[in-house]
Structures are given as C-alpha cells and as structure tokens.
Amino acid sequence: MITNNLVPTVIEKTAGGERAFDIYSRLLKERIVFLNGEVNDHSANLVIAQLLFLESEDPDKDIYFYINSPGGMVTAGMGVYDTMQFIKPDVNTICIGLAASMGSLLLAGGAKGKRYSLPSSQIMIHQPLGGFRGQASDIEIHAKNILRIKDRLNKVLAHHTGQDLETIVRDTDRDNFMMADEAKEYGLIDHVIESREAIIK
C-alpha cells in the first residue's frame, strides 16, 4: 500500500529573497495550530509544543486552534486539553469538518466565547472506549480505570457546556452526533460562523 504524506510548501518573498515553509510552519506564524486526523501521542505532542511555543512568543495574544479530528487516545488528548487550560493566551477553537470523541472535548475546551464551528461541521460526544485482555484481576483494574476516565471526561464536558453532569452522562452513553447549530445550543461551541471575519478578535 502506498500512502501520500506530502505536506504542501509555501514560498514567501521577503526583503532577503524567497523562503520556503511547510504549510503548518507558515500557519504557525499566524498563531494557527491545526489538528488534522487522529489524536495520538505524536499529534498531541506536536500540538502541545506549538501551544507552548506560541505562549512564549506572546503570552497576551490569542491562539487559533483548528480541529478536524475523529478523536483518538484519551491520555494524549487530555495532555492537549490540560495545556490549553494551563497556558496564558486564550485558545480559540474552530471545528472544520469533524470534531468527534476527544476532538469534541478539545473543541469545547477553548476559551469561553471563542469556540466556533463552520456550519456544515459535525460534533460527536460519547463515552471513552476500552478493551483489554489478560488475567481477570488485570481486566478489573483496567475497567475501574476507564470508569475513572469516563467520570473525569464527563465532568470536563459539564464544566464547559453548562449542562448538568446527569445530562452529560446520559448524552454520552452512545455516539451522539450534532450539527453545528445543535452543538451551539448544547454548549459545546459559542458561535456558528461562515467567514473568518466572524471570529472575535
């Protein structure tokens, strides 16, 4: 199987001549961080590093975090979430396409009043998935841990949406897909936008 992981290059003209950037580095200059695809240790570490770098560059200037993700590893995603809460700059979150599972939690975890979605995007919340094989005692340990993780994720969603915990527990019991306007009504985002100008500066 052949995979194409080509990253586009942007040529920028400066006083000193031309300089080539990969597209993500060029976006980073505009304080834009992009999560595209699964949340895993690698993608999470890249996002965390970019967030910390942008804070060090200017702790008072907003960061724009674009999300198009089906979700992924809870531990990796919570590392990104905790970093978003830890750093000083407001992190604007913008859903383009899909923010599912851990992707939806990262979307909801943006700065209050600065969480956005494009109109055709979908947002999906659900409980964490788990599977483990081994001795019965080990399975029991992992089952207890996943219940603790589920409780933590539900509390985070309740905090950011304004929904009570009982509602979150019920609504995350199965895959729960929402269109952008429904996600706004639920409290996962603050604005449905159709143009860049609609993002609050």
UniProtKB/Swiss-Prot annotation:
<dbReference type="GO" id="GO:0051117">
    <property type="term" value="F:ATPase binding"/>
</dbReference>
<dbReference type="InterPro" id="IPR018215">
    <property type="entry name" value="ClpP_Ser_AS"/>
</dbReference>
<dbReference type="GO" id="GO:0009368">
    <property type="term" value="C:endopeptidase Clp complex"/>
</dbReference>
<dbReference type="GO" id="GO:0005737">
    <property type="term" value="C:cytoplasm"/>
</dbReference>
<dbReference type="InterPro" id="IPR029045">
    <property type="entry name" value="ClpP/crotonase-like_dom_sf"/>
</dbReference>
<keyword id="KW-0963">Cytoplasm</keyword>
<dbReference type="GO" id="GO:0004252">
    <property type="term" value="F:serine-type endopeptidase activity"/>
</dbReference>
<keyword id="KW-0378">Hydrolase</keyword>
<dbReference type="InterPro" id="IPR033135">
    <property type="entry name" value="ClpP_His_AS"/>
</dbReference>
<dbReference type="GO" id="GO:0006515">
    <property type="term" value="P:protein quality control for misfolded or incompletely synthesized proteins"/>
</dbReference>
<feature type="active site" description="Nucleophile">
    <location>
        <position position="101"/>
    </location>
</feature>
<comment type="function">
    <text>Cleaves peptides in various proteins in a process that requires ATP hydrolysis. Has a chymotrypsin-like activity. Plays a major role in the degradation of misfolded proteins.</text>
</comment>
<protein>
    <recommendedName>
        <fullName>ATP-dependent Clp protease proteolytic subunit</fullName>
        <ecNumber>3.4.21.92</ecNumber>
    </recommendedName>
</protein>
<keyword id="KW-0645">Protease</keyword>
<feature type="active site">
    <location>
        <position position="126"/>
    </location>
</feature>
<comment type="subunit">
    <text>Fourteen ClpP subunits assemble into 2 heptameric rings which stack back to back to give a disk-like structure with a central cavity, resembling the structure of eukaryotic proteasomes.</text>
</comment>
<dbReference type="Pfam" id="PF00574">
    <property type="entry name" value="CLP_protease"/>
</dbReference>
<keyword id="KW-0720">Serine protease</keyword>
<dbReference type="InterPro" id="IPR023562">
    <property type="entry name" value="ClpP/TepA"/>
</dbReference>
<comment type="similarity">
    <text>Belongs to the peptidase S14 family.</text>
</comment>
<dbReference type="GO" id="GO:0004176">
    <property type="term" value="F:ATP-dependent peptidase activity"/>
</dbReference>
<dbReference type="InterPro" id="IPR001907">
    <property type="entry name" value="ClpP"/>
</dbReference>
